[in-house]
Regions:
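Catalytic nucleophile serine of serine hydrolases
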Residues: 330
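A conserved active-site-flanking secondary-structure segment within enzyme catalytic domains
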Residues: 337-394, 398
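Flexible phosphate-sensing "switch/lid" loops adjacent to ATP/NTP-binding sites
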Residues: 1-325, 342, 370-371, 382-510
Length: 510
């Protein structure tokens, strides 16, 4: 049975996910078989495993850091918000329904055995399991039936490290307050504190470190600096998509729809010199981009209505008609078509059949069905028309997560793909406009831009349209780049945390 170590935070965005990923990398480098675990994740960014199970992307990143394949055992419960008060509940990789917060908390206790089983199965296969908590362990209003923070630590018999964010101020109050709100037996399980996102001279901090250790009896096991590392992190979502990006030679605008999902589909463009990737929410912010991307969403028709009401749909149509490239992924792809039929009234919660007119940029029609399609895919681009013709024949891979079936003229298909882990036939997928400006494309495949050379070909085509070219542009090996970033993170963990002490905590247990 594996030894377990739990990472909790004083608050959301304290850096739990990144610290967990870094420790996974260090343990892996030191020769241990290590796996991440988070009993319950709330996120719109998800991933499909080789078995077709849906899980949170944060644990996928941590699995990559640990040099192992992601498994739904690492995240048995995923909550995907569909509205301000409701979420789709996914258990062991499969959706079991959409629930209001009260409904979920009323049945949450029934999921504890599923969490225990997933953890025990995972622990039987590895030397170390790094468990990540959620939010704060001191949320006393939702402590009943907890299996996410200290409740999970008890289930796993795991010593706990508490991560605190100093960048936002009030770090000592947050450490002390968190520990004091824990029950005595829970507080005894916290064996160390990590101060995260520090800027400046750590010597100035030392008197405070000594005082907080004296007041709490819990040692500080390290101070991590504000680290510039490019690792996909659930906690960094708000910073990534709200930060202002300087407009460069090529300007790509991602429409930040209210229920945007899988924003990580576009990270690869940030690695290409001369490209700005902006997330926009208004016509004013949209400006004059070279390409507009409409991303995936957890509520296609709701977000399409938002596009209409905000004036963004009219702006996108105007851009498309003037020749700007428009690319839709998953829900964004569905929006580009003629209409979206919801025979069960699932998305609007009415339970009544309804049809929502699409944007009419692609000759496709989508009908929602009850069963979600979750599968890894591989294939290649077909005969791509227009500005992105250089993509024709290039291999692609990724995964699908959607509840709709889309009909389209096969001669307008964008790709031909088949399931990676099943004996499935090759099928036409995606669509493009083959008349007029030849500048609108759509696909269900998440990760479509990550394939070798695909993002670069797109940027080269956008440059050529402007009569420019980028000299000595390098094809990006996204996988190798991510490996380098994990190593940078591990180096910082080793340099700034007392790994000898952490190994002692791990060995001693609770």
């Amino acid at each position: 049975m594996a030894k377990a170590l739990m990472i909790v935070g004083t608050m959301s965005n304290a850096g739990k996910s990144l610290v967990t990923a870094g420790l996974c990398r260090v343990f892996n480098q030191d020769g241990y078989k290590v796996a991440p675990f988070k009993s319950q994740n709330m996120a719109l960014n998800s991933f499909i495993t080789a078995e077709g199970a849906e899980m949170g992307r944060a644990q996928v990143v941590q699995a990559e850091a640990a040099n192992i394949e992601p498994s739904v055992l690492m995240n048995p419960i995923l909550l995907k918000p569909t509205s301000d008060s409701g979420s789709q509940v996914i258990v062991n990789g499969e959706a079991i329904g959409t629930m209001k917060a009260g409904e979920y908390y009323a049945m949450k206790h029934t999921l504890r055995p599923e969490v225990q089983k997933a953890f025990d199965t995972l622990a039987s296969k590895f030397d170390i399991v790094c468990i990540e908590g959620a939010g704060s362990p001191a949320e006393i209003n939702i402590k009943k039936d907890d299996f996410v923070n200290m409740g999970m630590a008890k289930m796993a018999k795991a010593p706990v490290l508490l991560v605190a964010d100093i960048d936002r101020g009030g770090v000592f109050a947050s450490i002390y307050g968190t520990l004091m709100l824990l029950e005595d037996d829970e507080r005894a399980m916290v064996k160390g504190v990590i101060i995260n996102k520090f800027r400046g001279d750590v010597e100035i901090l030392r008197p405070g470190l000594k005082m907080i250790e004296e007041k709490t009896g819990v040692p500080i096991v390290g101070v991590l600096p504000m680290l510039k590392v490019d690792i996909e992190d659930e906690d960094s979502l708000s910073e990534r998509i709200s930060g202002r990006s300087e407009v460069k030679l090529i300007d790509i605008a991602v429409v930040r729809i209210p229920r945007m999902s899988n924003y990580t589909d576009f990270n690869v463009f940030e690695l290409i010199p001369g490209v700005s990737l902006r997330y926009v929410t208004s016509v004013r912010e949209l400006g004059q981009p070279d390409m507009i991307i409409i991303p995936g969403t957890k509520n296609t028709t709701g977000d399409l209505k938002w596009l209409r009401q905000s004036g963004m749909e009219a702006a996108i149509l105007k851009h498309a008609n003037s020749g700007t490239v428009v690319f839709g992924v998953c829900g964004g792809y569905q929006m580009l078509g003629k209409q979206i039929s919801d025979p069960y009234g699932e998305e609007d919660g009415t339970g009544k059949a309804n049809i929502t007119p699409g944007m009419g940029l692609l000759e496709i029609e989508t009908t929602f069905i009850e069963k979600k399609r979750t599968i890894q895919m591989a294939g290649k681009f077909g005969q791509v028309q227009g500005i992105f013709s250089a993509l024709s024949g290039l291999p692609l891979y990724g995964y699908e997560i959607h509840s709709g079936v889309t009909e389209f003229p096969e001669e307008k298909a964008l790709t031909s793909i088949s399931p990676i882990h099943e004996n499935g036939e090759i099928m036409a997928e995606g669509s493009q406009n083959t008349e007029g400006k030849l500048n609108v494309y759509g696909t269900y495949v998440h990760g479509v831009f990550d394939g070798d050379g695909i993002a670069v070909k797109i940027v080269e085509a956008l440059l050529a349209k402007k009569g420019k070219k980028m000299e000595d542009i390098q094809t990006i090996n996204f996988a190798e780049y991510k490996r380098q970033q994990y190593d940078i993170l591990a180096d910082s963990i080793r340099e700034n945390l007392d790994m000898k002490k952490i190994y002692e905590i791990l060995e001693a247990g609770v």
